[in-house]
Amino acid sequence: MLDLFAGTGGIGIECVSRGAREVTAVEIAHVQQNWIISCCRQLGIKNLSVIRGDVFKFLSACRTKYDLIFADPPYALEQLPTLPDVILERDILKEDGWLVIEHGKDTDFTSHPRHVETRTYGSVHFSFFQ
């Protein structure tokens, strides 16, 4: 599982707790990276690795394929409209894998050719791609 814009690492940690064998979390902020590492130590999690860096630089070099990619970018991220293409064109999503992008109401991915559905929970939207 790949957790992009990992923040506090909650999604990756939850995936580990639900049986994910390996999680890679990418976060640019040093404070959040340290928080994730600290939480993993406290919880005894050994199969979550944290990469501190820019998500787009990570993606440009990534060669690993994932069955689940979750991205929670800042809603005002300039590259947000192109994020599905940036990820999917890298060919890092396994066949039958899922890409999930969290976003606000002002972003609409429904016209993307690999968009499957969008779910809304209050002001938060999750768009699913295959």
Segments from the language model and where they lie:
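Class I S-adenosyl-L-methionine-dependent methyltransferase catalytic core
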Residues: 1-130
